[in-house]
Amino acid sequence: RLVLWELPEGFDYSYKYADRSFFDAVQAELQQGELPLFVRPDGSLSDTSYTNIVLWTAAGYRTPERPLLEGTEHRRLLEAGRISTAPLSVADLSACRGVYLINAMMPLESAPLLPPPEGLIRRV
């Protein structure tokens, strides 16, 4: 289950594989089976602690313009034209059919499709 979690103001993490302490602290606050979907302070969607996200919408497969880290599967899908970037916000979640979690080990074809998260945005 995805849980909305706000990133700190100015948070930049181009190398989320190098120092995972922030992500570990967030995960420690969640229940078993919950995964944080990070939201920037302006309400724009980012990604999770270990995947990029793709929203399944009526307009096709959309991914946030500014992920924390662009993964190889994310780049491959963009270059192939299978997904497109959009200025996605929390409000867009209510209109999507689901959220795919993708990374190098989970290509879109076999990626889990989760229901959009509901509820308030949590903060550290």
Feature locations, PLM:
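Helix-start/capping segments and mature chain N-termini
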Residues: 1-124
